[in-house]
Curated annotation (Swiss-Prot):
Any further remark recorded for this protein: TamB is widely distributed across the majority of Gram-negative bacterial lineages and is far more widely distributed than its partner TamA.
Record topology, Cytoplasmic segments: 1-6
Disruption phenotype: Loss of cell aggregation when adhesins are over-expressed in a double tamA-tamB deletion mutant. The single mutant does not exhibit growth defects but it shows a slight increase in outer membrane permeability. The tamB-yhdP double mutant shows defects in outer membrane lipid homeostasis and sensitivity to bile salts and various antibiotics such as vancomycin. The loss of tamB and yhdP severely compromises the integrity of the cell envelope, and causes lysis and alterations to cellular morphology.
Domain of life from the UniProt record: Bacteria
Keywords per UniProt: Cell inner membrane, Cell membrane, Formylation, Membrane, Signal-anchor, Transmembrane, Transmembrane helix
Entry annotated with the keyword Cell inner membrane: yes
InterPro entries according to UniProt: TamB
GO cellular component: cell outer membrane; plasma membrane; TAM protein secretion complex
Topological type in the membrane: Single-pass membrane protein
Name by which UniProt lists this protein: Translocation and assembly module subunit TamB
UniProt note: domains: The periplasmic domain is elongated (up to 160 Angstroms long) and forms contacts with the N-terminal POTRA domains of TamA. The C-terminal region mimics outer membrane protein beta strands. This region (residues 963-1138) consists of a concave, taco-shaped beta sheet with a hydrophobic interior, which can accommodate and shield the hydrophobic side of an amphipathic beta strand, potentially allowing TamB to chaperone nascent membrane proteins across the periplasm to TamA in the outer membrane.
């Protein structure tokens, strides 16, 4: 073999070995694992925990990668490749899944990257693939990425894609639980601000007119070439749920749907549906990114942002961006408005036509309407370099008269000429003509005219007629201004007082004024200002002469006269003042006399004096007899005295000090200070030293104490208050008796509090002040009167603390009740100005409900223990709570309880932003099981749900109602609605109503309830509406004994409550019953109560007949009642049918008209029966007087066998009944003794003797 052949053979073998090695490493599972192991060993910072499977099912677990500034953790990576697609010249990836991914990037720790030279633009980029690429499924599960202060979190993401040639198709995609937490802009700005070492001079800003001229001299929309996208994109369906962005604003998107495609520059938006916390958006449309850029977009939105909550927006955009663009907007809801606009963005000058129309506009948008604009029409036509503007509307509102506003104006990019602004109101017109120019400085020239203004009709208490003219001109430039009013005239009258204002004036931002004359006149009262405050000289006089202010203006009264003079120069001014006023009155405020005298000069030093005396200041709850203020001296030595005499505050203080102009420092002393207040006198125990340093902007306040008979507040050390400082305040004693004047009569408090506050601040540094506050109570007791009973609450320990340090606020408390439990806890808020994260705990230990027993009457009590162990989490916007609250052994016995409660328990478990409730209410008969849950993950849309189920729970409302109920009800609550649904079965009940109290009187429909101020009370309405839908089933063992009716009830009722009120639907039947009235024993043969609406308006269908055993001739006679409850219709019927007179005779007498019995005897029996029926209450009261319970007088029998019977209980189990015949005088004595609850022994003695054993059955 030749050398060439050997070399060729060796090369071939090497190539085959290389290819075989690559094939082994890539194509086999063992080789692939070997590759990952090598990468784990040789790649710095890479750590692969576990590798399983091959290309068809490859899984990497516990993967980590760390480099300076970069840390990546991956719990699980899965890749499944469809190798069979390679035979078809395509790439198929069946699955690419990432789970539990954690990425942290700190750009400050990363090494600086090398600067990459920008590549030259080589023309449009085309992306295409020579082989089809299919990614069947890509999934992200629990992915968290943090880049500096920005956090991105994805809970679940699934998608797929297909890339063939130039078309990329995104398969149906789902994204759930996306959170993007952005840093606040203010925080980023603070981090990025760096003080420059050298101040570079800034070029002068262009005037606004020149800036606008340059802006509109060329098209707003620059020349645009056709946009060439590198590939065609088709998003079949993108769904998102619970997407949230936080930062300076918090945006939550509940659901989102996107369908869009872009083929060769033609973009089509099939659907964009967004449901977020700010509102709902639905959009669709098309756009072409070439030629004239035609667009056609439709958008509908409903806002959920105050004050425009519920606002509906409809937007339609059509035309072309490079030709004419047309926009239409329709607003409905709090704001109703139509906007139509046409513009050409690609044309210089920005041609623009805008029309705005609205039938009515209100302010505020929600709640009570304070202002209203009707028939608003606004029109803008032309270009921004030459446009006309017009507006028409009518306005009205609170405290403003109805007016019609008309505006006509013309303008360009450098000025606007207000041809006329007319406000037609108060039977006159107000017109404004003006020119506003901003070519160089902002300058104006205007003329305001008042013509025929008459307020008599709109404001009858302040009638006036006014005419006037005001001319003004001025300019504003570089932070300075100047103004000139060459003419100011106002004439007319106010409440028959002549009004005259005449004058001219001019001034500037340097407070230099020239006032040739300004005269104000109102009736006999006048004021005049004349002079100038020049650059150097000061010569200004102001005089007031008001001998008759009474009724000059509504609520004004008194007299005033005075003079103020300003003389000297700017360097050495002098102020002279002498003003006297008497009998001043304004609305409810009155002042008997005011006297002001002053003479202040400023040469090398400011010196002078000022005396102010005010007598008899009076207004509701305030009565000050005298206030005097006296100040005199110079800069070097001056003093001030203040004296106040009156109620509710009186007192005095002295302030003396000196000022060093060179050092800009003032030192002083506050002394002789005391005040009388509603909580007692306060006085200083020592003088307060004051020191103000103007250069440092700092004041020092020396140690001192304020003393009160019930309190002492001290500053133990000097307070230096400035940009930075510290203050310590000690509360040495505070007796709660001080609060008595502010407490209601039903509340009393006693005890002593002590405490301390220590606060330090430094405004030159970021962050909040540092400080702490502590309060400790000793012998504290609060007594609250409830239902005329005192409820004392004594505190063994009462400590409160508050602290703010290291950007964390903390509130703590420990409250231990005497002979009872303890309530303690602490709440922390971290980063109060930023994220405001919550932490802490709340504990309740061995709190016994027996502490409220003093408010109960004899025989009533409460028992039970409350305990809790709760932990706080989350943040202020989304608070979280963990732990459990338990109430065990709770037993409340009282007349107000509808059942006999036995020891019961209730537990509430909190888990973050959700909670569950479980409990059992035990009674002597039956139990009620409570279950529920609550969710406040959306704090503005919280919800709660409670279910109650029970079986034959005995309900007792003495002395009338006993019943067994089986509830199965559900109560649900949201911020907008309370609902109560379910079913209540009443299988057994006994309802007994003997009579109503003699004092029971129905409330008149025209009763008006008054409050403590004798003002009508407004009816209380639920802040949250209540809806109910309850089914009440009345079983077969429900009986009623009321007002002579003894009957059994059955039926079903549907209790419905909504915004219309309470309603009943259903039917109550009376299958059997008896009615005793007016001596007659009637049997209810048919009874129906039909409910369909208000509960007090049932439809009656009742038939009651006389007892056939007490009716002769086998005749049935009765009464039929039909119709609504408030308008029933009663008729007498009989069987067989007969005349009304005969039927009435059988109903009342039990005999027909042709009966042989004596009419007098029958009438006697009927009258006695009627009388006895009406005397039941009187007989009962007589029996109670003699110790006989349930004494009753009744009649028995019919015709000649009629008897008057008296019965009563002489002993709890022994009943005596004595009957005497009305016509035969035969007496019958009956003794009945109860052996057992339903077993009786009865002995009868009369014409016949009998001894019976009776047993009572109930059906």
């Amino acid at each position: 073999m030749s050398l060439w052949k050997k070399i060729s053979l060796g090369v071939v073998i090497v190539i085959l070995l290389l290819l075989g090695s690559v094939a082994f490493l890539v194509g086999t599972t063992s080789g692939l694992h070997l590759v990952f192991k090598a990468a784990d060993r040789w790649v710095p910072g890479l750590d692969i925990g576990k590798v399983t499977g091959g290309w068809r099912d490859l899984t990497l677990s516990d993967v980590r990668y760390e480099q300076p500034g970069v840390a990546v953790k991956a719990g699980n990576l899965h890749l499944a490749v469809g190798l069979e697609c390679l035979w078809n010249s395509s790439v198929c990836i069946n699955d690419l899944a990432l789970k539990d991914i954690q990425v942290n990037i700190d750009s400050k720790k990363m090494p600086p990257s090398e600067q990459v030279e920008e590549e030259e633009d080589s023309g449009p980029l085309d992306l295409s693939t020579p082989y089809p690429i299919t990614l069947t499924r890509v999934a992200l599960d629990n992915v968290n990425i943090k880049i500096d202060d920005t956090t991105v979190s994805v809970m679940d993401f699934t998608s797929g894609l297909n890339w063939q040639e130039k078309t990329l198709t995104l398969k149906p995609t789902s994204l759930k639980g996306l959170l993007i937490a952005l840093p606040k802009v203010a925080e980023v700005a603070q981090e990025e601000v760096v003080e420059p070492k050298i101040e570079n001079p800034q070029p002068d800003e262009k005037p606004l007119g020149e800036t606008l001229k340059d802006l509109f001299s060329r098209p707003v929309l620059p020349e645009m070439t056709d946009v060439h996208l590198p590939l065609n994109l088709n998003i079949e369906e993108f769904k998102g749920e619970q997407l949230r962005v936080t930062g300076d604003t918090d945006i939550t998107v509940s659901t989102m749907l996107l369908k869009v495609s872009s083929i060769d520059g033609n973009t089509k938006l099939d659907a964009l549906d967004i449901d977020s916390s700010q509102g709902i958006v639905n959009a669709s449309g098309t756009a072409q990114l070439s030629d004239n850029w035609p667009v056609d977009i439709t958008l509908n939105s409903t806002l959920n942002v105050e004050p425009l909550k519920g606002e509906k927006v409809k937007l339609k955009m059509g035309g072309a961006l490079r030709e004419q663009l047309e926009i239409g907007v329709n607003l409905s809801g709090p704001v109703d408005m139509d906007l139509r606009a046409q513009t050409r963005l690609a044309e210089a000058g920005l041609p623009l036509n805008v029309e705005v129309n609205s039938k009515q506009l209100y302010w505020p948008f929600t709640g009570e309407k304070q202002y209203q604009a009707d028939d608003l029409k606004l029109k803008l036509t032309g270009k921004m370099t030459d446009y006309t503007l017009s507006m028409r509307t009518a306005v009205k509102g609170q405290e403003i008269p109805p007016a019609t506003i008309t505006l006509d104006a013309k303008g360009n990019e450098q000025q606007v000429n207000l041809d006329k602004l007319t406000v037609a109101a108060l039977e006159g017109k107000t017109e404004l003509k003006a020119l506003l120019d901003w070519q160089q400085a902002i300058s104006w020239r205007g003329e305001l005219t008042l013509n025929g203004i008459n307020t008599a009709k709109e404001f009858p208490d302040w009638p006036s007629k006014l005419n006037g003219l005001i001319k003004t001109r001025g300019s504003l430039y570089g932070g300075t201004w100047q103004m000139d009013v060459p003419e100011l005239k106002l004439t007319g009258n106010v409440k028959q007082n002549k009004v005259n204002v005449d004058g001219t004036l001019k001034g500037n931002s340097y407070m230099q004024w020239m006032i040739p004359g300004l005269h104000l006149e109102l009736g006999p009262n006048s004021a005049e200002v004349k002079g100038e405050l020049g650059v150097k000289d000061l010569n200004l006089d102001a005089t007031i002469n008001a001998p008759g202010l009474d009724n000059a203006l509504p609520g004004l009264g008194g007299t005033a006269k005075g003079l103020v003079k300003v003389r000297g120069t700017v360097e050495a001014p002098q102020l002279l003042a002498d003003i006297t006023a008497r009998g001043l009155r304004w609305q409810e405020l009155s002042v008997a006399q005011v006297r002001v005298e002053g003479d202040i000069k400023s040469t090398d030093q400011i010196a002078g004096k000022l005396d102010v005396r005010v007598e008899q200041i009076s207004q509701p709850d305030v009565n000050i007899n005298l206030v005097t203020l006296n100040a005199k001296g110079s800069e070097k030595q001056h003093e001030l005295q203040l004296r106040i005499q009156g109620e509710p505050v009186s007192g005095q203080l002295n302030l003396a000090g000196s000022f060093d102009r060179k050092e800009e420092r003032w030192k002083g002393t506050l002394s002789n200070t005391r005040f009388q207040t509603p909580v007692g006198p306060w006085s200083l125990t020592r003088d307060i030293a004051l020191d103000y340093r103007n250069k440092e902007q700092k004041i020092s306040i020396g140690p001192h104490c304020w003393l009160n008979p019930n309190a002492e507040l001290c500053v133990p050390q000097t307070i230096d208050a400035g940009a930075e400082g510290r203050a310590v305040v000690n509360l040495n004693r505070f007796d709660l008796a001080m609060l008595k004047p502010f407490m209601p009569e039903t509340t009393q408090a006693s005890g002593i509090f002590t405490g301390k506050a220590d606060v330090a601040w430094d405004t030159t540094k970021e962050g909040l002040p540092q400080g702490s506050i502590t309060l400790s109570g000793r012998n504290v007791q609060v007594t609250q009167t409830v239902n005329d009973a005192a409820l004392p609450v004594a505190f063994q320990t009462l400590n409160l603390t508050a602290e703010l340090r290291n950007n964390r606020a903390e509130l703590g408390w420990t409250i231990r009740l005497t002979n009872n439990g303890q309530f303690d806890g602490q709440v922390q808020v971290t980063d109060p100005q930023g994220r405001r994260n919550l932490g802490g705990n709340v504990n309740i230990r061995n709190f016994n409900l027996a502490m409220i027993n003093p408010i109960f009457t004899r025989g009533e009590k409460a028992a039970g223990m409350v305990s809790a162990n709760l932990r706080l989490g989350g943040d202020v916007q989304s608070p979280q709570l963990f732990g459990q609250l338990q109430v065990t052994g709770v037993d409340i016995d009282g007349n107000f309880m509808p059942f006999d409660m036995q020891p019961s328990q209730l537990a509430v478990n909190f888990n973050g932003m959700r909670s569950t409730l479980a409990g059992t209410v035990r009674t002597q008969q039956g139990e009620i099981y409570l279950n529920g849950d609550a969710d406040w993950s959306q704090i503005e849309n919280w919800r709660a749900r409670v279910t109650a189920k029970g079986s034959k729970v005995r309900i007792t409302v003495p002395p009338m109602v006993r019943m067994d109920v089986s509830p199965d009800v559900v109560f649900e609550a949201t911020p907008n609605l309370f609902t109560l649904d379910g079913r209540v079965d009443v299988p057994w009940a006994r309802i007994v109503v003997h009579d109503l109290p003699e004092s029971a009187v129905g409330v008149s429909s025209d009763v008006v309830m008054l409050n403590d101020n004798l003002q009508p009370e407004e009816p209380k309405t639920a802040s949250i509406p209540i809806n109910s839908n309850l089914i009440v089933h009345v079983g077969n063992n429900v009986r009623i004994d009321a007002f002579g009716l003894k009957a059994r009830l059955t039926g079903d009722l549907n209790v419905v409550q909504d915004k219309q009120g309470l309603g009943l639907n259903g039917q109550i039947n009376i299958p059997e019953g008896r009615f005793h009235a007016y001596g007659q024993d009637l049997i209810v043969r048919k009874g129906e109560l039909l409910f369909s609406g208000p509960p007090d308006q049932p439809y009656l269908n009742i038939e009651a007949i006389r007892n056939p055993d007490a009716t002769e001739d086998d005749v049935i006679a009765g009464v039929r009642v039909t119709g609504l409850a408030d308008e029933p219709k009663a008729e007498i019927f009989s069987d067989p049918a007969m005349s009304q007179q005969a039927a009435l005779s059988y109903l009342l007498r039990g005999q027909g008209l042709e009966s042989d019995q004596s009419d007098s005897a029958a009438m006697t029996s009927m009258l006695i029966g009627l009388g006895v029926a009406q005397s039941g209450q009187i007989v009962g009261k007589i029996g109670e007087t003699f110790g006989v319970s349930n004494l009753a007088l009744d009649t028995q029998g019919v015709g000649d066998s009629s008897q008057v019977v008296v019965s009563g209980y002489v002993l709890p189990g022994l009943q005596v009944k004595y009957g005497v015949g009305i016509f035969d005088s035969i007496a019958t004595l009956t003794l009945r003794y109860r052996l057992m609850p339903k077993l009786y022994l009865e002995a009868v003695s009369g014409v016949d003797q009998a001894l019976d054993l009776l047993y009572q059955f109930e059906f």
